[in-house]
Amino acid sequence: MYRTLFSLVLSRFDPERAHRLAFAAIRALPVIGLGSLLRRFTAPDPSLAVEALGLRFDSPFGIAAGFDKDGEGVIGLGALGFGHVEVGTITARPQPGNDKPRLFRLLPDRAVINRMGFNNHGAGAAANRLLRVRRARRRPVLGVNISKSRAVAVEDATADYLISARALAPVADYLVVNVSSPNTPGLRGLQEREALAPLLSAVKAASGKKPLLVKIAPDLTDEQIVAVARLAVELGLAGIIATNTTIARDGLSSDPAVVEAAGAGGLSGAPLAARSLEVLTLIRANVPPSLCVISVGGVETAQDVQRRLDAGATLVQGYTAFLYRGPLWARQITRGLSALRSR
């Protein structure tokens, strides 16, 4: 039914407006008392629970950063069946993001191009909000994804990250350093070892005992990916998230004119699946089994999630397919996982 509604109605809305409307409904779920009722319908089978990062996840499937930028919908997203919610990306300074339009659907590819630019209310506002979330009786595992403020020079990035880390580590279950978005100038250069090692070391020190992960791009070479993986192990990070969106446009089914009109930005969704799986396999081959690897990119079905788990993922995230498949997507994934495992 949702796919029909999407095809006939929602796909005609501006993508960012459609997101705002859907997110408002999700935020409202606990306010109007539907959260507890929904949980009875969406709760994953207990057999799907995962122990990772010193935490218990109700299922291996969560929603990636980007959907809930400021931590306003954590409880509602948990009620929809996500085992963890990664909020953000959050920056030290509030910022409006890039000019609109900045979000574009590629319907034939079940994909999205975004150049949002980390629009968010800043680390201070998020910390106050997430403190209330942590006090909730029922909530999913809470990850917080942080990155550099756009107004801050790359040379000053570490100090900027530290502001966010110190504010948000106390209210997060785990913290993620995002150095891989293509929508902040100069950010991806921080993935080079010479820049990344001191940055991660500083954030790790500022985060105390909070599990720290780094999120990387799919556009790195295999050699660069191995280098980051080995650095994460060397520095004692808790894990790696692979991958962010891609700047590649290879193999798309959408009209090239539509793709060109969308312009610059990160591509997410089904076209990213193959590369994301490749990166996961490469990372897992170069890190110990104890390191948490979260796979994200092109995940649509329970079969996709199980394939990532079989390839060595500790946890799996999705986002873009949520826009195409609707509010019961997490439930479909967890029910599907249970069915696959009962065969």
Swiss-Prot record:
List of catalytic residues: S181
Pathway listed: Pyrimidine metabolism; UMP biosynthesis via de novo pathway; orotate from (S)-dihydroorotate (quinone route): step 1/1
Biological process terms in GO annotation: 'de novo' pyrimidine nucleobase biosynthetic process; 'de novo' UMP biosynthetic process
Required cofactor names: FMN
Enzyme kind, highest EC tier: oxidoreductase
Entry GO MF terms: dihydroorotate dehydrogenase (quinone) activity
Protein name according to UniProt: Dihydroorotate dehydrogenase (quinone)
Highest classification ranks of the organism: Bacteria, Bacillati, Actinomycetota, Actinomycetes, Micrococcales
List of residues binding substrate: K69, N114, R115, M116, G117, F118, N178, N183, N244, T245
A Pfam family it matches: DHO_dh
UniProt family annotation: Belongs to the dihydroorotate dehydrogenase family. Type 2 subfamily.
The EC number(s) this enzyme carries: 1.3.5.2
Its biological purpose: Catalyzes the conversion of dihydroorotate to orotate with quinone as electron acceptor.
Topology in the lipid bilayer: Peripheral membrane protein
Subcellular location: Cell membrane
GO cellular component: cytoplasm; plasma membrane
Residues where FMN binds: A65, G66, F67, D68, K69, T89, N145, N178, K215, T243, G269, G298, Y319, T320
